[in-house]
Amino acid sequence: MPELVPPSTRVQRSFIDAMVEFLDEGRGGRNDDSMVARELREFGSVWDTPEGFAQYVERLQADAHESTLRASYLVPSTTYWWVEGPEYLGRISIRHRLTPRLLEIGGHIGYDVRPSARRRGHATAMLRAVLPYALE
């Protein structure tokens, strides 16, 4: 049964496979400003190494803190991964506050389900599982 977990190096191989799926569907291009695209551009070249992937996981965890340096258009957010055993299925992020743009497009919660796991209710299940954390 899938579960919501903090980002972890435990699912590195499956996570990388999911990112390849996103690339195959056209994500990550210059005009794509999604979280997946930003991370593909920033970390895609280092995910294959244990050190690079650990650095990426640490960055996701640091993004939850207001004191973390970030681009002016980004806000603090807490990210959880949706996994089933060693399989990465998707992610969901809670933005701690909103910019004027996020008020119009984006909102407080953003999510991605890997293409091969779509149409199975994962987005609904992730949202249901993350709502208690969003109330904190």
Residue ranges and their predicted role:
Residues 1-108, 115, 133:
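GNAT-family acyltransferases
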